[in-house]
Amino acid sequence: MLRWLKADLHVHTVLSPCAELEMGPRAIVAAAAANGIGLLGITDHNAWANVPAVAALAAREGIAVLPGMEVQTREEVHVLCFFPDLASLAVVGEEIRRHLPRIENRPEVFGDQVIVDAEENILGFENTLLLNSVELTLEEVQDITRRAGGLFIPAHVDRPAFSLLANLGVVPPALEPDALEISGRVTPEEVKSLFPALTGYSLITSSDAHRLSDLATPRATWFYVAAPTLAEVVLALAGLEGRKVVIVSSLENKPHDLPGRL
C-alpha cells in the first residue's frame, strides 16, 4: 500500500567539519522524530563513516536512512549520492576518498571531523580535510554512483555557491540527474521562474542541516511510496507506478490531495 513519507535527504553529522558538535546520531534521530521525518539522508562531505551509526539508531525509532554522502566535484559543485545499502556506499566512499587531496585537517580552523558510534562515543577523528573538491568531474561522480546502483542529485542548485547553476550556469547535457535539490527558501514555482531550464526535472528540498534547529524547515519533501527504500524513491522521482514526490509547506501535516509530480 502506498503512503506519504516525509523526508529530509541532506543532513550532516559531526564528521563534517562545518557541522556543529551537537550533530551526533542520537540528537539527529531525536530531532528527525520531533519533526515527523520518516526518511533521512545522511550526507557528510566526501565521507560516510557516521552513516552506519545513524542508520542503526534510526531503525530502532522506525526512521529509515538512505546511505549517502555529499561529494564536492572538481567543478566545486555539491552533489548528493545515495546507495542501496551500506556495502555499496562503502565501496564508492573509498573511491571518493582516493580522489580527495591529502591535505590535513586543521580543527582549530575548519572544525573537528568526529567519527562516532550509535551511542555517540567517539571512535576517532578523520585527519584528511573533507572540505576540498575531489579530483573527479560531475560526470565521473555520476557514473561511479550509477554503477553502484545509486541515486545522483545535485545539491541546493539555486544557491550562489557550490551549486550547479552558480558554477556552471546550466545543467550539462551529459548530466542526467535523478532529481535536483532546491533550498527551503524558495518554492518550486519560484525556482522554475528564476531558472526556466529546471522545468521538467523532479525537485526535492532538504534542510542541509549543520545544526539540530536546521531540521525544522519551512518546506518539506514528501514521497508517496510503498516503503522507505532507495528503489521506491527512484520510482517516486520518476513518477512511476503511482509513486510521486511533492514539496509542501511544513505547516501542512500531509500533502493529501496535492497534485503528484512537480
Q: Language-model segments: which ranges?
A:
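Generic signal for short, ordered secondary-structure residues
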Residues: 10-11, 37, 120-124
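Ser/Thr-glycine-rich phosphate-binding loops at phosphate-binding pockets of nucleotides
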Residues: 13-14, 40-43
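Active-site gating loops and adjacent loop-to-helix segments of metal-dependent hydrolytic enzymes
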Residues: 83-126, 170
